[in-house]
A protein has these predicted regions:
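Conserved short-loop catalytic and cofactor-binding motifs
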Residues: 7, 34, 75
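Glycine-/small-residue-rich active-site loops that bind phosphorylated ligands and cofactors
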Residues: 38, 79, 93
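Basic amphipathic alpha-helical segments that dock to polyanions
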Residues: 58, 62-65
Length: 126
């Protein structure tokens, strides 16, 4: 497994830093993961899948991902307008990273406060 060398370059010039600059943002990874899971997705479907994101934030974030060539936007000239989003080949190259992050999260997930409280309620070892 290769490592980014910090000793030879400023941290801002490493592959790690570059990758983070593309995927860092409150909803970028969620959007990429949604496209990975569902393939071609329309704007309102994406909003429904993510839920808490505003229409403006979704629009801006999709434009950024499109500008970075991670997401493809296909617009169909019809009424009403139809726009679909999908991962580009470049975006698809992030799938192994997204999968690894998902696996890591499942393996190392800490119990939530709600779950912890439920466990504590039933703990009679006092």
């Amino acid at each position: 497994m290769g490592k980014c060398s910090i000793s030879q370059a400023n941290l801002g010039e490493t592959g790690f830093s570059y990758t983070l600059s593309l995927i860092n943002g409150k909803y970028k990874m969620t959007i990429l993961y949604t496209l990975m899971e569902f393939g071609v997705v329309r704007f309102n479907e994406m909003k429904k899948y993510i839920g808490e994101i505003s229409y403006k934030t979704l629009s801006v974030t999709l434009k950024e991902l499109e500008s970075d060539q991670l997401v493809h936007r296909e617009e169909y000239p019809q009424i009403p307008p139809k726009v679909e989003y999908s991962l580009t080949e470049r975006g698809k190259s992030l799938i192994p990273i997204l999968d690894m992050m998902c696996e890591w999260g499942e393996k190392h997930r800490l119990p939530s406060r709600r779950t912890q409280k439920k466990v504590d309620i039933w703990d009679n070892t006092e």
